[in-house]
Amino acid sequence: MRSLILAVQFLTRLPTPQLRTFDPAWLAGAIRWFAVVGLLVGALVAALGWLGAWLDPWLAALLMLVTWVWVTGGLHLDGLGDLADGLGAAHRSPERFLAVLKDPHTGSFAVITLALQLLAKLVLLMLAVRHGVGWSALVLLPAWARLGAVWWTTLPPLSAGGHAERFAWRHDWPAFWLSWLLLAALSAWLAPVLLLAPVLWWGWRRFLWRRLGGMSGDCLGAGIELTETGLLLLAVVATRLPLA
């Protein structure tokens, strides 16, 4: 139960019981619950979308996006923005890249990337409602993205002392594969297009390894955001295919 509470606290801003003591090392155990927290996020997002869809797809999309950002506290968006600044300003210098990641200021690369990301999600959420992607797909989608983050932590951490280092090399593989099997079974039944999620996982992991040689907390957050958007795009496209 402690690790579940920590996972909810780490990945969301939802209220949870307060732990009397805390050890940063406990975060490593929380990683087994990432997919479950993703389902919780997805359920809240889909619920608000369902309410808004009674009036208009755009209203549903806006409610879902606002809920998504609020529930997560913009945690993963922050990672995406930091990574965009780092990649844009580092000029392939590892030292410069890490320095930019630690800089609390927001640069132009981050602003542009975050604006495009939010706009893409808003439009794709509207299209998902309009074309009947299905609320179950929206519930499952954040879980797939967060389970991907578990796999990305098999990469070496880029720097010592960050959240990513606490997760690296400390994997509960039985929990990972159980989560994968459950998500795969639900997706095969409710939203088959989401079974392509591991392809997006692999693409992001390959990018991190080839471009950066490892991962950081910002890399994990950015990957979650991009996986969510990628799966939204795939889900919308699937509704327009002849076999959909």
Swiss-Prot record:
GO terms for cellular component: plasma membrane. It is found in: Cell inner membrane. Its EC number is 2.7.8.26. It catalyses: alpha-ribazole + adenosylcob(III)inamide-GDP = adenosylcob(III)alamin + GMP + H(+); alpha-ribazole 5'-phosphate + adenosylcob(III)inamide-GDP = adenosylcob(III)alamin 5'-phosphate + GMP + H(+). Its cofactor is Mg(2+). Signal peptide: none annotated. The chain crosses the membrane at residues 33-53, 57-77, 109-129, 132-152, 176-196. InterPro entries: CobS (IPR003805). The keyword Protein transport does not apply. Belongs to the CobS family. This is Adenosylcobinamide-GDP ribazoletransferase. It comes from Laribacter hongkongensis (strain HLHK9). The gene is cobS.
